[in-house]
Curated annotation (Swiss-Prot):
This is Metalloprotease mig-17. It comes from Caenorhabditis elegans. Residues 1-20 form the signal peptide. Changing residue 65 to Q: Impaired gonadal localization and slight impairment in DTC posterior migration. Impaired gonadal localization and DTC posterior migration. Elongated pharynx. One of its GO terms (cellular component) is basement membrane. Disulfide bonds join 279-367.
Length: 509
């Protein structure tokens, strides 16, 4: 009984003391942290108090060692058809096929990264980070896998469409509403804007995308399998949301050998993405038809641009930017002998840049903004990163575009080492006929001469070679004058002996 009477007032005193302390803490706006430690079964507590000045100092110290940058982690996914194509190129060796395909996907990413490294968004650059790859080695694992029920449903739908078309021809009439709908989803038409206006829900902002003029009809799998482009992006989005074991990423790109078909049935569409849905789970994605190497990476960069918030140049909201200027976000990208037009294909117009800057201000795009610890420039690490053309040689670039038997065209009328940087010509090895695509530049880093490689469509000196080779006899190599080296370094045998010396002087040969 006595214990009960004693405990009550003690309890009340404790409550009053805690409440009083809370009020005092609120008034002073000080923050206290309790550090607890257990040693030999005994618990110790240490209260550490911080004032506003202390906290501000901590923030200052934190920020002084940190910097915010734009960074995007990109996952590259290959479908089953892509795997089959590389299996054929690897003579049925599955291990080699997977290895080669991984290198190809990495090369596509590196080329896309190079493109974005050259674009400034205000005072910032968007740094692409390679999140990894995922390859569908079985048909059932493919993100675009179509079940028997879906195939039957599509067959019935196609039959119905053909029936309606025949009826339409018989009646010699036009369905205005259907025509408008077809136009408003097909990237060949300016009225695409109807589905991407700012007052539309994001889920409806789907973009049937980039088209390429005068495309070759055949490539490594002859594009015999087709899929509706809208269905492709929808299936890929659902697939991404269902997967639990994928590498962590903020945008996913599906590389497919399916021929992407627009709603009106043509195959000019080469990619599709949601507009402005960067960072959104599953919706931050794009589907890219694998036309071939440098061209595929350009489409990939284009689609990521849409996801970041860019519209097509020349659209209603971007009317001041002419699509004919051939910038990255043009409706149709084409190859051109004009140097500036070629360079524009790797740049963004002011309209695209401004659209992306505005979209990145949205809270939904916060995943792109990251705090990084300040570090000194590590030039050596950057120098040792392989360029896409080092990962995938020119022969493989031909094979991906046209088939496993194709090699670079050596016909004197087509082949000039330096010209491959802007356009590669290929032949199947059994005929003199050479083929190319309307836009088919070599990957950056593709060899285009002795100690030369392709950068931005130009064949330039490969300074990286200086680090990769050494003179066998440096004393002998250093005794020759520049005029003599100019002559001697043309010899392959001499170059092998004086590799580093000839590499340094390579620009004069």
């Amino acid at each position: 009984m006595h214990t009960f009477c004693i405990l009550i007032p003690t309890f009340l005193v404790l409550v009053w003391t805690t409440e009083s302390a809370r009020r005092e803490k609120q008034q002073s706006n000080d923050i206290s942290f309790v550090k607890r430690k257990v040693q030999d079964g005994l618990k110790f507590s240490r209260v550490i108090k911080y004032t506003n000045e202390t906290i501000q100092g901590m923030k200052t110290n934190f920020n002084s060692n940190k910097t915010q940058e734009l960074s995007l982690d990109v996952l590259v996914v290959a479908d089953f058809l892509s795997y089959q194509a590389f299996l054929e190129m690897s003579n049925g060796d599955s291990h080699r096929a997977i290895h080669n395909l991984k290198e190809y996907l990495h090369a596509l990413f590196e080329q896309t990264k190079i493109i974005y490294d050259g674009i400034s968004f205000g005072n910032e650059t968007l740094h692409m980070v390679f999140a990894g790859t995922w390859i569908a080695t079985q048909e059932r694992d493919c993100p675009l896998w179509i079940s028997w029920a879906e195939e039957e449903e599509e067959r019935v739908l196609n039959e119905e469409i053909r029936r309606l078309e025949e009826k339409e021809r018989d009646l010699n009439s036009t369905f205005v509403d259907d025509t408008f709908f077809m136009n408003s989803t097909d990237s060949d038409n300016s009225s695409t804007d109807a589905l991407i206006s700012s007052d539309m829900p994001k889920k409806l902002r789907k973009f049937v995308d980039i088209t390429l003029e005068e495309m070759q009809e055949n490539n490594s799998t002859e594009m015999t399998l087709k899929i509706d482009s809208k269905k492709a992006i929808d299936k890929f989005t659902i697939w991404l949301k269902e997967q639990t074991g994928l590498p962590r990423h903020e945008h996913a790109v599906l590389i497919t050998k399916f021929d992407l078909i627009s709603i009106n049935g043509n195959s000019a569409t080469q990619g599709m993405a949601y507009v402005g849905n960067i960072c959104e789970n599953g919706d931050s994605s794009s589907v890219v038809e694998d036309i071939g190497a440098g061209l595929t990476s350009l489409i990939m960069a284009h689609e990521i641009g849409h996801s970041l918030g860019a519209l097509h140049d020349g659209a209603y909201e971007t009317a001041e930017c002419d699509s004919n200027d051939n910038y990255l976000m043009a409706v149709a990208v084409s190859g051109s002998a004009d140097r500036q037009s070629f360079l524009n294909s790797r740049r963004m117009s002011n309209c695209s840049i401004n659209s992306i800057i505005e979209n990145l201000k949205e809270p939904t795009a916060n995943c792109v903004k990251k705090w990084k610890t300040k570090k000194g420039k590590d030039v050596s690490q950057k120098d040792f990163i392989k360029k896409p053309g080092e990962l995938v040689k020119i022969t493989r670039q031909c094979q991906v575009a046209f088939g496993p038997t194709f090699i670079p065209c050596l016909h004197i009328g087509y082949f000039h080492e330096q010209s491959i940087c802007e356009r590669i010509w290929c032949s199947d090895g059994e005929s003199d006929e050479c083929q190319t695509l309307n836009y088919f530049p070599a990957f950056d880093g593709t060899e285009c001469g002795y100690n030369m490689w392709c950068l931005e469509g130009s064949c330039v000196q490969n300074t990286k070679k200086w680090m990769d080779c050494k003179d066998i006899n440096s004393k002998t190599c250093s005794k020759y004058s520049t005029s003599k080296l100019k002559h001697y370094c043309k010899s392959k045998d001499f170059r092998e002996i004086c590799c580093r010396t000839c590499a340094k002087k390579g620009k004069i040969y």
